[in-house]
Amino acid sequence: MPSHLARWTGLAGATLLALSAFLGGAFPAGPLRSTPVSIWQGTNGPLILAAWLVGTGLMAYAWWALRDGGPSTRWALITVGLWMLPLLIAPPFGSRDVYAYTCQGASFAGGISPYEQGVSALPCPWLETVSPIWRDTPAPYGPLFVLIAGAVVKATGSLTASIVLFRALSLVGVVLSAWALPVLARRAGVPAKRAVWLALGSPLIAAHLIGGPHNDVLMLAALVGGLAVVASHPGRPGMLLVGGLLLGVAVAIKSTAVVVVPFAALAATAGPYRIRTLIRDGGWVVGGAVAAVVGVTVAGGLDFGWVGGLSQGGAAVAWTSPPTAVGQTIGYIAALFGGHVDALPVTRGIAVVLLAVLLVWLWWRARTRDPLYYAGLALAVTVALSPVVHPWYWTWPLFVLAATARRTGWFVVVALVASFLVLPNGIGLPRFTKTVGAPLMTLLVIVVVIWLVRSARAARQPVATD
């Protein structure tokens, strides 16, 4: 597809997404328990669904068509900016999380720790806008985001103004990412135009990080910013400390970013890997990250009770999480024989152990390879083995791999598929496709495992020589 055609195709798709948001987005007074059928049967239902699916499809096609990069970085940035214009003025869509952000901010502003009680404890003046699952659940976010949410509510005092400010903050995250991604890409030997296009042009960014809006883009901006600073100044203590502080900011927004810190420490070393240089150079990165997290926690008066609150995100059950899908499938098979098996605690527990092993293994391999690329892989396995996987979680590895992977590959396909899993009012299609989705995901897990085992065996085979 010619680049100019891709630009206008994506803009048409973004305009259709905005139309579907105005007709059936995640409005404050919207229904909290709708289904695809109830949307179809409601006012403008067919138009809402058609605009959403066609719009997502157009954006996805344009993004995929130029997955190896457009004409230039400047062209990519201008195109992404054009695509975001209609979305910035649309009501929230693709998720209702912004209402939970606002109520958690109201709780904190009211003197209640959102890590100890749900938003119903205040109660939040906009409680009816929050999905029931989050009303009595502690916040699963880091202390910095709680501080930000509290400041937003204090500054605005209204729900609408808070949503506008949250979306503005998401836009700031996109702008900061637009600076950091080319820097990180150049250090990794990846075309900057491709990195910007893959990371910021993805439909996941439009439909979730901006449309939601979601706080993930703030975490990602600090994350890629920290990696860019570290990769650009190996062996320089002052700049490594700055990079570590940025990574700590990312962790203080969403704790998932912590898996990147050990890889950033490797990237900080000047010259070949040695334990001495790792301690000398990587220590500045780790120290900066720890200082940022501790500083924000103490400044917010939250102590470290927020660490326990981070485990609250696993209440949802959806087949988009591979370990959850395997557990669901085991239960379905048992039901065929008249049994009842709740395998979720087992499969999720195994996934946690496997994740720990894989992270250590990836770090060990990264010592003599590209730690920046392996940081992206670490985020990918973290998402894949999490007990709950929302579609926008795949933006985490997407941002890093877009700037560090030498070839576009599976991560682009995953992001493409994930773009179609949520409807404009925020309901997730996996909720209504469990009996089909879970077995299919389980089958995919089996196929991937077999492929990985065969690839590992092939890599060990000696190369024949004449």
Locations of regions flagged by a protein language model:
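Membrane-lumen/periplasm interface segments of multi-pass, membrane-embedded glycan/lipid transferases
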Residues: 316-347
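Multi-pass membrane glycosyltransferase architecture that uses lipid-linked
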Residues: 1-312, 348-466
